[in-house]
Amino acid sequence: MTKKERLLRAFQNQEVDKVPMGFWYHFSPDDDFGQKTVDQHLELFRETGMDMIKVMCDGYFNYPNPYIEKVTSAEDWFGLTPMGEDSPYIANQVLRAKRVVEGVKGECCVFYNVFCPMSLMRFGTSEELLMKHLKENPEAVCHAFEVIAEDVKTLVRKLITEAGCDGIYYCVQNAETFRFTAEEYRKLVRPSDLKVLEYANTLSENNILHCCGWAGDPNRIEVWQDYPAKAVNWAVYVENLSLAEGKKFFGGRCVMGGFDNRKEGLLYSGTKEEIEKEVERILKETGTTGVILGADCTVPSDIDHQRLIWIREKLDKM
C-alpha cells in the first residue's frame, strides 16, 4: 500500500496495512521564503518516512491588505475589499505549495495550512484591536471577515487546482471559552469559517479540519463539531478530549493526532520506550481504522527527528 493509498483509506475509515502518521513544525525560512523552505518540508518527509506532508504557511500569517493601515475606527472595516487574484500574498504561497507537490512526485498527499478569516485578521491587526472593534461594530468586522474569506477562497482554489494540493488543512481558532459564548461564536465567526471550508469541499473531498488550541486555552469545541471535513485534528491535551472520545464526538470521522505537541509532553521529552508504549496505548484505545497518528498541533522546531522515526518504526511493527 502506498503512502497516498494508506492515508486516503484512513480518511474513508477503511482498513489499512498500518496506521499512517503525520507531524509538522514551523520552519525558519530564508528571506524570500523560497526554495529553502520547500527543501525543509521535503527533508522532514524523507527523513522520517511520514505518510503525508502539511505545508506550513510560515511567512504568511499576517493578512497584508494595505487598507488595514487606514482603519482608525470599527466602522472603517466596511471599506475593506479583497486583495484579489494577483496578490503576491496568494501567488507566493501557491508557488511554495506547487514546489512541494512537484518535489514529492506523487509519493504522498500534500495539504496546505490555511487559517480561518478571523485569525488572519487578528494576525494582520492585533488581538486587542480586533476584539475592541468587534464589540463596537460587529457588523463592520463581520463584513471584514467575509472579505478576507474571499481572498482565502482564491488561495484555496489556486492551491488545489494550480499547485496540485490534495486538500487543505483548515485551522479554526478563536473559540476560547474566555472569548465568546457558543452562541456568539456561531453568530459572528461561523459564517466566514464555513464560507472557506464549504468552498474547499467543492474542490476536494479530502480536507482536514484543525481545531486549534494554540495558546493552551480550552475552546468551545462543540461549535466546530458539525464543520464538514474528511478528517479532524484537535488538541487532545488542551480540550481534554481523547482521540477515541473525539472520534465519537465528531461523528465517527477519521481522526488525527494523539500526542501532546508541547515540550513537556512524551513526544518531545519521553524515552523511546515511553513513546512506543504511548503509540500502543493510543491505538488500543482508538483502534486502527480511521486514525492518523500525529500531535495536537505543530511540534517544537528543535525536536529530534529520531523521535518521529521511533513512532514510524513502531507502527511498521504493529
Roles of regions detected by a PLM:
Residues M1-D31, K36-Q40, D51, V55, ...:
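Active-site loop segments of alpha/beta catalytic cores
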Residues W24-D30, D51-M83:
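Alpha/beta catalytic barrel-like cores
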